[in-house]
């Protein structure tokens, strides 16, 4: 796969050589390596000799060979960036209880001890937060399924493990209503971690560009919704309505054209802002199914046709296949997709 993009560092041409995926099955993580070749400038052709007429040479006192000029080859610099993405942090109560300390506080550093080295080694690491940080002062006890609420110490543990971004758009984002929804963002952002997919206000930008080793990667995050409530805002997980418009990136399976139109607009904005590679995280599919369903496959192909470079899925709680999709619109474009990352942390051994 070769792409030619205008690099905003001068007039260099950037070639996206390949997005490589390596599965770390023990950690249910995916490492995406973006490799770019940066050219030093446009190729300048070597000078050619001017045409000559067949005439007798005119003798001169001293004949010398004209100097030859050799144009140097453009210098190429290879830049790489590794993005590690791992699955859902599903904080069931047995998992929450493992973090309880004798003084009443919580510490979850130990749950990342086997993947911390991988997380820290990547240039940029992402995890899906499938719980909320509502605290206990707002009438919500710590709880697991079906309405998740976890101690703030989990956010501290993700930072300690080396994560840079938490995905916050999923079907459990609104488990503790708008209070917990917004407090979750405040807790995570307060630690200096980035969030993607949910927002404190409708005015916030719905995508981000992360500069990783000089490579600008545009990112989006979406979750499925289960219809709209009376206020015209989405219901997540089939329960309470969000109630505020424009604070969550979501799609409805019964209105995918609206989703594609919105993503296409954001994709254009990211590229205009300098994104050299683009990726989207999508919370979709059917839980506990080992293979992507028809909706996932069709949506993935459409996103590939739109020009996204990488698609990473979540929600099924199991690892689903990796594939390399060929665009129907551009013969030179391919998209790497992992249909589902599975769980990173949970108390699930079997479906349901």
Give the residues covered by each predicted segment.
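Acidic, metal/ion-coordinating pockets
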Residues: 15-41, 52-53, 58-59, 65-352
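Intrinsically disordered, low-complexity polyampholyte segments enriched for Lys and acidic residues
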Residues: 3-6, 61-65
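N-terminal Lys/Arg-rich, disordered targeting/topogenic segments
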Residues: 1-13
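Juxtamembrane extracytosolic/periplasmic "stalk" immediately C-terminal to the first targeting helix
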Residues: 44-49
């Amino acid at each position: 796969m070769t792409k030619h993009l205008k690099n905003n560092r001068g007039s260099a041409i950037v070639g996206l050589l390949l997005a490589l995926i390596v599965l770390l099955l023990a950690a249910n993580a995916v490492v995406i390596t973006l490799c770019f070749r940066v050219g030093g400038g446009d190729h300048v052709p070597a000078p050619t000799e001017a045409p000559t007429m067949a005439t007798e040479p005119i003798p001169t006192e001293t004949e010398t060979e004209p100097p030859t000029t050799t144009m140097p080859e453009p210098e190429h610099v290879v830049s790489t960036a590794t993005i590690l993405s791992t699955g859902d942090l599903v904080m069931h109560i047995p998992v929450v209880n493992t973090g309880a300390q004798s003084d009443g506080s919580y510490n979850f550093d130990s749950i990342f001890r086997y993947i911390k080295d991988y997380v820290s080694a990547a240039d940029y690491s992402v995890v899906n937060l499938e719980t909320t940080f509502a605290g206990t002062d707002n009438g919500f006890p710590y709880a697991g399924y079906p309405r998740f609420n976890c101690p703030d110490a989990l956010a501290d543990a993700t930072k300690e493990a080396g994560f840079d971004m938490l995905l916050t758009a999923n079907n459990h984002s609104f488990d503790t209503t708008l209070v917990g929804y917004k407090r979750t963002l405040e807790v995570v952002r307060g630690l200096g971690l980035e969030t993607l997919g949910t927002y404190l206000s409708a005015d916030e930008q719905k995508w981000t560009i992360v500069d990783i080793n000089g490579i600008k990667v545009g990112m989006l995050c979406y979750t499925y919704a289960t219809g709209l409530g009376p206020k015209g805002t989405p219901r997540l997980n089939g329960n309470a309505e969000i109630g505020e418009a424009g604070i969550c990136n979501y799609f409805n399976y019964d209105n995918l054209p609206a989703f594609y139109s919105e993503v296409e607009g954001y994709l254009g904005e990211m590229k205009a802002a300098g994104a050299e590679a683009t990726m989207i995280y999508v919370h979709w599919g059917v839980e506990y199914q080992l293979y992507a369903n028809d909706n996932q496959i069709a949506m993935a192909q459409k996103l590939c046709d739109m020009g996204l470079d990488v698609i990473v899925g979540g929600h099924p709680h199991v690892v689903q296949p990796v594939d390399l999709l060929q665009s129907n619109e551009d013969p030179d474009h391919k998209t790497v997709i992992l249909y589902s990352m599975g769980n990173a942390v949970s108390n699930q051994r079997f479906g349901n």
